[in-house]
UniProtKB/Swiss-Prot annotation:
Compartments, as annotated in UniProt: Cytoplasm; Secreted; Cell surface
Chain's gene name: eno
Keywords: Cytoplasm, Glycolysis, Lyase, Magnesium, Metal-binding, Secreted
Regulation: Inhibited by fluoride and phosphate.
Gene Ontology biological process terms in this record: glycolytic process
Record's function text: Catalyzes the reversible conversion of 2-phosphoglycerate (2-PG) into phosphoenolpyruvate (PEP). It is essential for the degradation of carbohydrates via glycolysis.
Catalytic reaction(s) noted: (2R)-2-phosphoglycerate = phosphoenolpyruvate + H2O
Protein name: Enolase
Originating organism: Thermotoga maritima (strain ATCC 43589 / DSM 3109 / JCM 10099 / NBRC 100826 / MSB8)
Length: 429
């Protein structure tokens, strides 16, 4: 099938942090349109594809994206007009070649990705198909287990917690709807516990709380308390996941990590994590070491990878070259997937496919700067990834993804699968 792209345009809109981002629209020959907004991260891996910002301090404190918008309207549009909207790989290849750099720094990953996503949406809309079905075909049916970021630390908060995200994982349920309900009830229970202990319960960028607690371990204890008080069983119905974002507390010059006010070597930090895993129902740990500390990842996965999902985010940046190195070294048993780390839909799908073929799980993820766009909800089902990270149980830009997944589960009906603990196929649980 050949359906011509007749118009491509972009504009500057705002993300959930009030910072500018790129929205693209792609129009097909019959007038069908696809629209997409790109997200933006706060803690970014150094190997990520680059978003372009204007750096004009007089506009949006230098964070404007008029240059990226111009790149869509003046460079990308002429190249894509006349192309087949149903040939996503060729569209994305054209975008990559048009940019010509390894990290998409000429046109900007924000410009390229907005268009790539909008093309996929336009094609789905033309066929009258939901996006997940267009991208994933008839076998797209697995609803993801949500990893819900309810306590924030690190670069996502102005508090004294080193680890960036403390998540609840409602994996012991039979449907996404039930898992979401459990997550919401635990979130509200957690708010009450924190409030009664005198903590501020304002929420951060991803909708989680950012209390000043005595240690990272105390944050885990508070989560366990919230799970139990909400009427659920930790370690059976609801588990804990951590995103350490260890690059943010790593001193490159000294080669040490700073955790709970102490210097720790990779080996000592490994022991610290192992103690936490032994004491608490922790099922997933993301970026436990800095993005270049390959040896530590390999050793840690060797030690605990049979019972804990070890996830590479900054380590891989959704890049198949870095992922193939990780597969070869057995550095992790899971990868975090972020569309804007790599910059096109096709490359994102390639990374998921490579991971799954090598018995690694893939977690489809949001960024801290999000929007009302629900592309990643459909992507999670399209790829049967089994996992999604899309924030806490507050803030509309996070809830939008959860609500889209509720719709998809309802639409799939009896075909829908929520695999719960079985989604953790790379560990022996």
């Amino acid at each position: 099938m050949y359906v011509e792209i007749v118009d491509v345009r972009a504009r500057e809109v705002l993300d959930s942090r009030g910072n500018p981002t790129v929205e693209a629209e792609v129009v097909l020959e019959d007038g069908t349109m696809g629209r997409a907004i790109v997200p933006s991260g706060a803690s970014t891996g150094k190997f990520e594809a680059l978003e372009i910002r204007d750096k004009d301090k007089k506009r949006y404190l230098g964070k404007g994206v008029l240059k990226a918008v111009e790149n869509v309207n003046e460079t990308i549009a002429p190249a894509l007009i006349g192309m087949n909207a149903f040939d996503q790989p060729l569209v994305d290849k054209t975008l990559i070649e048009l940019d010509g750099t390894e990290n998409k720094s000429k046109l900007g990953a924000n410009a390229i990705l907005a268009v790539s996503m909008a093309v996929a949406r336009a094609a789905a809309n033309y066929l009258g198909l939901p996006l997940y079905k267009y991208l994933g075909g008839v076998n797209a049916k697995v609803l993801p287990v949500p990893l819900m970021n309810v306590i924030n630390g690190g670069q996502h908060a102005d508090n004294n917690l080193d680890l960036q995200e403390f998540m609840i994982v409602p994996a012991g349920f039979d449907s996404f709807r039930e898992a979401l309900r459990a997550g919401a009830e635990i979130f509200h229970t957690l708010k009450k516990i924190l409030h009664e202990a005198g903590h501020v319960t304002a929420v951060g960028d991803e909708g989680g709380f950012a209390p000043n607690l005595s240690s990272n371990e105390e944050a885990i204890k508070v989560l366990i308390e919230a799970i139990e008080k909400a009427g659920y069983k930790p370690g059976e119905e609801v588990f804990i996941a951590l995103d350490c974002a260890a690059s943010s507390f790593y001193d490159e010059e000294k080669g040490v990590y700073y955790v709970d006010g102490e210097e720790k070597s990779s080996e000592v930090l490994m022991g610290y994590y192992e103690e936490l895993v032994a004491k608490y129902p922790i099922i997933s740990i993301e970026d436990p070491f800095a993005e270049e500390d390959w040896d530590a990842f390999v050793e840690f996965t060797k030690r605990v990878g049979n019972k804990v999902q070890i996830v590479g985010d900054d380590l891989y940046v959704t890049n198949v070259k870095r992922l193939s190195k990780g597969i070869e070294l057995k550095a992790t048993n899971s990868i975090l997937i972020k569309l804007n780390q790599i910059g096109t839909v096709t490359e994102t799908l390639d990374a998921v496919e490579m991971a799954q073929k090598n018995n690694m799980t893939a977690i489809i993820s949001h960024r801290s700067g999000e929007s009302e766009d629900t592309f990643i909800a459909d992507l999670a089902v399209a790829t049967n990834a089994g996992f999604i990270k899309t924030g806490s149980l507050s803030r509309s830009e996070r809830i939008a993804k959860y609500n889209q997944l509720l719709r998809i589960e309802e639409e799939l009906g009896k075909v829908a699968e929520f695999r719960g603990l079985k989604s953790f196929y790379s560990i022996k649980r």
